[in-house]
Amino acid sequence: MNKNHKTRVKALLLLLLTMAQGTTLMAQNAAEAQLPLAFPSAEGYGKYTVGGRGGKVYEVTTLEDGGQGSLREAVEAEGPRTVVFRVSGTISLKRQLRISNPYITIAGQTAPGDGICLRGYPVSINADQVIIRYLRVRLGDETKTEADAVSARGHKNIILDHISASWSVDETMSVYHCDSITVQWCIISESLFGSNHIKGAHGFGGIWGGNYSSFHHNLIASHSSRNPRLAGGAGFVDFRNNVIFNWGFNSIYGGGALHKNGSDPTFLVRHTTVNIVNNYFKPGPATAPGEVSHRIANPSWANGDCGKWYVAGNIMEGSERVTADNWDGGIQPNSSLPQVMDSIRMNVPWPSMPIAMQSASHAFDSVTERAGASLPRRDKVDERIAKEACLGQTSFEGNTYKAKHTMKDKRLASGIIDSQQDVGGWPELKSTTPPPDTDHDGMPDVWERRHGLNPDDPADGALTAAGSPYTYLEVYLSSLAGE
């Protein structure tokens, strides 16, 4: 068989595989379309997550890490549950906050005042059916914890919405080898580069992937690398309408095959098939000059494969050539084998779960304006990160990155920090008096009366609202988010 014939056969097989996958996925999407969304603005593969719907309401009334009225009490409880906040401020965790029991909704938008921040230890999602909205996780180096700020691995039906994660010692947010997940409208910023990681300088954005996973409208800012890294055997991944700002020596990379003897437990697949569509890439002061400055992705050869990549519609600020054709210099595999570029490129996207997609330029405006824990209001950290992304300039730096890596102009602050102290540490989050809730069902008395409910009946929040697929409690929580 000659080389041209082999190439045609390989292309035909890839086309047939994509068509078969498309038929299966469209049937799956049609069936799931009959289910209620996690909340009205939920999109992507995690949008049908049930969370704590219809379950018990836990009120967080203290910033202590443990005991009655604590966030930890609610997280460690069993059964369907929704967590609402009657206080704002920063919770200094004494150990990892591990979500081990399924069916939970954490509604950070309910906090009265400036919102909630978790400090000191990571949040680890080790359960299915998890909804987390409007929460900050800013790890820091005080506890010498070598961890991601937020992580999920080996679980299904998870949606993270409007999370602000930063100051991690390992990756900032890592969500991979999962199934049916969405990460949307999050700010993932300022991992700690020269901190206390056992491997030395670290400070990465995250490892992302998951078989049937959606990552959209996120701001990834000021990490040296893994912006993000696609896990080996990431599965079917849809990455669109994100903003990547001020990467250091690498932007997106990874995506090779997973070794068949890999040890990850659930949802393990060998392949990576990814759409990278309509994202906005904006190099910053830390971004290495040369090819890295216009690098969309650096597909990584692993176990004989670089994955399959559909890349289109992305803007690379500063490179008209790459913006006009993302494959003209924007895709830079780490293998020099001549067949690699042809083998990884898909000319049509895999048929992912649709979202309300924007152009890359419109996504930039939306993300910098709305992403992160913006309810009850953005904190000073997110305000600064969004402003830096808009201006293309960073305000702070640590001592390590500039000494180790090439920058276009070392007179500028790199934006890559070693400690949260480099940027002033955790901002104060003030609390205000929460609205009266006589029956402690998560809905204020005045809202219940307005909707014909009884402020003395703790059970009516679990009732399905008239003309809605949601419970009354869910309707209230969504109203806080303008939905």
Segments predicted by a language model, with ranges:
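Bacterial Sec-dependent N-terminal signal peptides
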Residues: 1-30
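Extracellular calcium-associated, cysteine-rich motifs in secreted modular proteins
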Residues: 420-483
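Acidic Gly/Asp/Thr-rich repetitive segments characteristic of extracellular carbohydrate-active
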Residues: 37-83, 460
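Short, T/G/N/S-enriched strand-turn elements that build extracellular solenoid repeat scaffolds
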Residues: 49-50, 69-76, 92-101, 120-124, ...
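Right-handed parallel beta-helix
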Residues: 92-214
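A structural signal for beta-strand register positions
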Residues: 105, 110, 136, 164, ...
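Extracellular beta-rich repeat passengers
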Residues: 233, 238-419
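Structural detector of coil-to-beta-strand junctions
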Residues: 122, 149, 172, 194-195, ...
